Amino acid sequence: MIYHCEDHTCNYWDEGEKLPERCPQCGRKLLRANEADMTGDDWTALGNTLWDAEASDKKRMVDCFRKAAYLGSAWGVCNLGICMEQGNGVEADPVQAFWLYQQAVEMGSLNAVCCLGVCYEHGIGTAPDAKQAAELYRKAAEYGSPRGQMLLAHAFHDGIGVEADAAEAVHWVRAAAYQRYGEGMYWLGVCYEYGDGVEQNWEHAVHWFREAAESGVSAAMADLGYCYEKGCGVEQSWEQAFSWYRRGAECGNLRSMHNLGWCYEKGCGVEQSWEQAFSWYRRGAECGNLQSMHNLGYCYEKGYGVEQSWEQAFSWYRRGAECGNPVSMSNLGLCYKRGYGVEQNWQEAIKWYEQGAQCGDLQSMHNLARCYERGEGVEQNEDRALYWYRRSAEGGNGGAMYNLGRCYKMGHGVEQNWQEAVKWYEQGAQCGNLQSMNNLAYCYEYGEGVEQNEERALYWYRRGAEAGSDYCMYCLGWNYSNGEGVEQNMTEAIRWYTAAAEGGNADAMHDLGWLYDHGEGVEQDMKKAICWYERAAEQNCPAAMNSLGECYAMGRGVPRDLETAMEWYRRAAELGEAMADYNMGWHLEQAGKLSEAYAHYRKAADGNDDSAWWALGRFYENGVVVAQDGKEARRCYETGEKLGSVKCKMRLARCKLLGIGGRRAKKAGLDLCRQALELAKESSEKEDYGYEAEMNLLRRTIAENES
């Protein structure tokens, strides 16, 4: 049964087994049609309804257009040509489509004029002829066809069959827009957005985007949402942005689907929901949106809104990469590099990094540079590494800026240049790269490549700390603890050490443990001290291992256990902790294992441990294990004194008084001994480092030589 709306201006036609009560377009009454009385345009209107219905019989649609054409409907002939061109309901036949368009043009169809012009422009069913296409577009445009006006605007914009003229293009876009043609209103908004053929004006852009969006143009909905998101030509409003993105997404606009997912991901204009974000990313990805494919892969990678799956992440990164998304290429390369969701394959990783880099993706450039620097999946090549670090850095990648600065610092692939290193650290830091902030602060602190400036160092340590760098948190805590570049403040020191420690910084864990151990800036708490020492030791922090050894050796916070202490010392010493070697030497000396003690003292001294030089000096002074040698003893004490050892200072003063290893200077020696003794008293009041025995020795020496 065929039926139509009683309102002929509505022109709704359809067919079915039953007659519905109301027209779905205007709500008026539907009337049963008599096929014998139907005109060609009636059959075309029925065919159009079947065209728009997803589940309709497309062959029946073509039959309707054939009947329309037979009855002399130019509209029907043109639509039959479109079916032939697209292969919709019939096998595609471009030549037949071209002929049908010609017939429809002769019958007066303006749409057919446009279709024929498109055939000439793209060579559909005929040889390409841009000039002929432009003439047909102009004919349709001048007769008032909004589609023709847009096609002519496109020709003037891109110089197709006519000389390019942006202003003339806008003239015809405006003509279509003033006819309330959706595409015309949208593109007029785009022209105002970019200042293309017209002076840039965001307010006008918003006006035409709104007009087009309200007429149902989904692309305009996406652009209007963007204007609200950024506050361009309209007061910024995430709620309005979200609303328009939703409308665009529900109308099938892929960009809107992605942006809607992003709103749900970030909680912008709507309550945050990873599940909703994932849902819209999936819809966009399945419809072919590259950004949605990438974000869907990211959701699977992190398990956001869906169960974590590297296999699914890899699959979507691959789809995005193969469709040309450079960011997906970078992530796909990472999957191959790490073996995430796929068997590890360095060659594939390099391949995708190179493709992403060639497409302009900054992270791909950065990753490729790292591979060249390390020789991962490709022959090591510092020149190529530097090239890609520079390309990425100059494009704005903060990580590449840091690594380029590091290359200049180390002289990798380029002559060492601290000034260039600082320049790139500065740029990386300004871009928010934490490692750049770390290194820039270090350069200011120690005057490397830039004039030393504690204030600037502290500024960047603070910036890095507030941005989440555990290393900067640690350095900031250290500055507050030691009053370096800032007034000493143990409360602030504890705060930043704690933040750094909880962020995983092993040095901060150790120093925080040390403060709890010695009750500095905080109430002494050996339980917390041991806890932080152990956490740092688990991360192979040698200083923490040594401190644990000291706690076990002295029974401080744990039961005294010399065997466990020596094990911790051994582990710390193997990692290069000189103080641990000294501590091992001390305990071995007390146990009478003098040769072993000497070996550890020597190793500790080579690591610049000041107490080890004191111990070595004693061995040489007294001829323990080694031949007695006053000069060597004196040299050891001098070295230790320069490193800050108070015990070495006392021994050196005694050597000068007694003439050990050099000329005796009684008066000057006595003065030095008294000065050293006073310094030792002050130091011993702060911390007992075994000063008492040395102080007693010095007192006896002074007493014996004063008479």
Question: What are the residue ranges of the model-derived segments?
Answer:
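Alpha-helical segment of the N-proximal tetratricopeptide repeat
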Residues: 38-67, 71, 82
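Short helix-capping/linker turns of helical repeat alpha-solenoids
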Residues: 38, 52-53, 70-74, 86-88, ...
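Short Cys/His-rich micro-motifs in 6-15 aa windows
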Residues: 27-36
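Hydrophobic face of amphipathic alpha-helices that form TPR/SEL1-like repeat modules
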Residues: 43-53, 77-86, 113-122, 151-158, ...
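Short cysteine-rich clusters marking metal-coordination/redox-active sites
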Residues: 5-7, 23-26
